From Swiss-Prot:
One of the primary rRNA binding proteins, it binds directly to 16S rRNA where it nucleates assembly of the body of the 30S subunit. InterPro entries: Ribosomal_uS4 (IPR022801), Ribosomal_uS4_bac-type (IPR005709), Ribosomal_uS4_CS (IPR018079), Ribosomal_uS4_N (IPR001912), S4_RNA-bd (IPR002942), S4_RNA-bd_sf (IPR036986). One of its GO terms (cellular component) is small ribosomal subunit. Part of the 30S ribosomal subunit. Contacts protein S5. The interaction surface between S4 and S5 is involved in control of translational fidelity. Signal peptide: none annotated. It holds the Pfam family S4. Residues 8-36 are annotated as: Disordered. One of its GO terms (molecular function) is structural constituent of ribosome. Belongs to the universal ribosomal protein uS4 family. It comes from Dietes robinsoniana (Lord Howe wedding lily). This is Small ribosomal subunit protein uS4c.
Length: 182
């Protein structure tokens, strides 16, 4: 993970660690003019590693975004941001997106009162995301909420930390997307 972060820059969804000061002598020899191919590849890899997608999954999202009305890039980012694992990460119920994926896979999360065990589940406006009533599920979420730094919550989400409940108000606005893509 740290190699990826060093190469691509900070990826908040992958890990909370930050790259070093940049005094790596190997890196200086590789600097120079970056080709268009390299720039596009790095931006694509940022998306893949940040959201934890395979190449095939990303291509499928690009295909869906291309068919939709509006800017393909913006629609793609909206699709990725509305995934259940990413929404759990944005709500602060998990420290990283892989951590959120694990919570979903282990069946700790309910969407509108139903267990959802698919991390790529596409949330819609007015979806209510809660934890299972089991003590273990609530304890896991409580630890994440207590330990996470309270960053500003995007305006398309609201959270009730006492009931461990999140609400999707609307589709994400472009200014709230946490990843800087060129």
């Amino acid at each position: 993970r740290f190699k990826k972060i060093r190469r691509l820059g900070a990826l908040p969804g992958l890990t909370s660690k930050r790259p070093g000061s940049g005094s790596d002598p190997k890196n200086k020899s590789r600097s120079g003019k970056r080709s268009q191919y390299r720039i596009r590849l790095e931006e694509k890899q940022k998306l893949r590693f940040h959201y934890g997608l395979t190449e095939r999954q990303l291509l499928k999202y690009v295909h869906i975004a291309g068919k939709a009305k509006g800017s393909t890039g913006l629609v793609l980012l909206q699709l990725l941001e509305m995934r259940l694992d990413n929404i759990l990460f944005r709500l602060g119920m998990a420290s990283t997106i892989p951590g959120a994926r694990q919570l979903v896979n282990h069946r700790h999360i309910l969407v509108n009162g139903r267990i959802v065990d698919i991390p790529s589940y596409r949330c819609k406006p007015r979806d209510i995301i809660t934890t299972k009533d089991k003590q273990r599920s609530k304890a896991l979420i409580q630890n994440y909420i207590a330990s996470s730094p309270h960053e500003e919550l995007p305006n398309h989400l609201t959270i009730d930390p006492i009931q461990y409940k999140g609400l999707v108000n609307q589709i994400i606005d472009s200014k709230w997307i946490g990843l800087k893509i060129n």
